[in-house]
């Protein structure tokens, strides 16, 4: 029982540190956790935790590349840092193309898919850093493009 409490404390401390959005390397996270009293933490454990909790590297408000956690599981929202993961949005006659930070496309596509047809999204296809989005019936590609710009607070 004591061991699971220690594990829960480690997870809480780990998540709290990542919410600060100031750690650019795994070794920085290791040292911060050691400072919090977790002496047995090492880089491989931090690496496994980053993977387990879906942490991504993105730019913080100071434009530094840092580790952060996406919104909690469930339907993601567009609150920071997700909107910071969208780098560019463009369109042609058929689709809206969204470029994201590496590794972020599937997370952003999941958000868009959760909005659904009522918001103009028929569906998405996501790679590592690129998303193709097609409009639902009754919506033009340009309308979808403009809605996505507003959603991620990009310039019109």
UniProtKB/Swiss-Prot annotation:
Keywords: Amino-acid biosynthesis, Arginine biosynthesis, Cytoplasm, DNA-binding, Repressor, Transcription, Transcription regulation. One of its GO terms (biological process) is L-arginine biosynthetic process. Pathway: Amino-acid biosynthesis; L-arginine biosynthesis [regulation]. It is found in: Cytoplasm. InterPro entries: Arg_repress, Arg_repress_C, Arg_repress_C_sf, Arg_repress_DNA-bd, WH-like_DNA-bd_sf, WH_DNA-bd_sf. It comes from the Bacteria. Pfam families: Arg_repressor, Arg_repressor_C. One of its GO terms (molecular function) is DNA-binding transcription factor activity. GO terms for cellular component: cytoplasm. Belongs to the ArgR family. HAMAP family: Arg_repressor. Regulates arginine biosynthesis genes. This is Arginine repressor. It comes from Pectobacterium atrosepticum (strain SCRI 1043 / ATCC BAA-672). The lineage of its organism: Bacteria, Pseudomonadati, Pseudomonadota, Gammaproteobacteria, Enterobacterales. The gene is argR.
């Amino acid at each position: 029982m004591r061991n699971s409490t220690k594990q829960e404390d480690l997870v809480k401390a780990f998540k709290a540190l990542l919410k600060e959005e100031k750690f650019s390397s795994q070794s920085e996270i290791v040292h911060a956790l050691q400072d919090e009293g977790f002496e047995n933490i090492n880089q491989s454990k931090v690496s496994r935790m980053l993977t387990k909790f879906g942490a991504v590297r993105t730019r913080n408000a100071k434009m530094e590349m840092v580790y952060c956690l996406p919104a909690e599981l469930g339907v993601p929202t567009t609150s920071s840092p997700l909107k910071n993961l969208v780098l560019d949005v463009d369109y042609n006659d058929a689709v809206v193309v969204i470029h994201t930070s590496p590794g972020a496309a599937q997370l952003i596509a999941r958000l868009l898919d959760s909005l659904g047809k009522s918001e103009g999204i028929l569906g998405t296809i996501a790679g590592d850093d690129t998303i193709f989005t097609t409009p639902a019936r009754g919506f033009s590609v340009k309308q979808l493009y403009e809605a996505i710009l507003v959603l991620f607070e990009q310039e019109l």
